[in-house]
Amino acid sequence: MSRQQEGGGGLLPRLKLAQDLLRRTGVWQLIRAWNPVIAGTIPLDIDTDASDVDVLCEVHDPDTFVRRAMELVRFPGFSLLRKQDTDPPAIVCRFIAEGLPVEIFAQPTPVTEQRAYRHMIAEKRLLEAAGPDAATEIRRLKTLGIKTEPAFTELFALAGDPYLTLLEVPDWSDNQVTDTVRRARRVRSECPFCLTVDADSDVTVY
């Protein structure tokens, strides 16, 4: 499938594919009451063949949500987990729909305040400032087995824990984003092998 955006400012083909899939299979209608949003790599056009369709929901009535989510047991690979190690606790539902892996992540937090959404906004800002070649490089790093957030901290020479560092980017000024992109280009041009990521531990190494 082409990664070029459809004419007339339409949706990216893979994002439209994901939306159509969720509606066609009845998943979207099932979770619509919880403000679902497709997040992750697909809306940014940096997904790979192994990428999930990530859906975020705002859920303040977890028992009701779980009862509805259990209707998805008809899909292969179904699992549902209540996670207590997140703040706040979350519900994660996974399954395969027409060959595509889907993950629904639900928390009692507005979607726009959830970590995964803020990561997506951070990545969007960096990609827009860096230009289309950046998305190509992120996909290349992901095909090497590097997860999305560590791939961004490698490409943009960001120090610290990738998952925490990216949470700061949505609050940066435009100048901060631009300066970060320029600095990363300088670092990579002066020493292209100085910045690596340990794909097994997700630790950024300088």
Feature map (PLM): residue ranges:
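Active-site nucleotide-donor binding segment shared across nucleotidyl transfer reactions
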Residues: 25-64
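Active-site ExK catalytic segment of metal-dependent nucleases
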Residues: 70, 101-110
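A short secondary-structure junction signal
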Residues: 68, 106, 115-118
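Metal-dependent nucleotidyltransferase catalytic core
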Residues: 9-23, 57-98
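Residues in well-ordered beta-strands of folded domains
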Residues: 37-39, 56, 94-96, 103-105
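Catalytic cores of NTP-dependent nucleotidyl/adenyl transfer enzymes across multiple folds
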Residues: 112-206
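Helical scaffold of the NTase/Pol beta-like nucleotidyltransferase catalytic core
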Residues: 1-39, 197-206
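Conserved His + Asp/Glu catalytic blocks
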Residues: 75-82, 87, 91, 103-107, ...
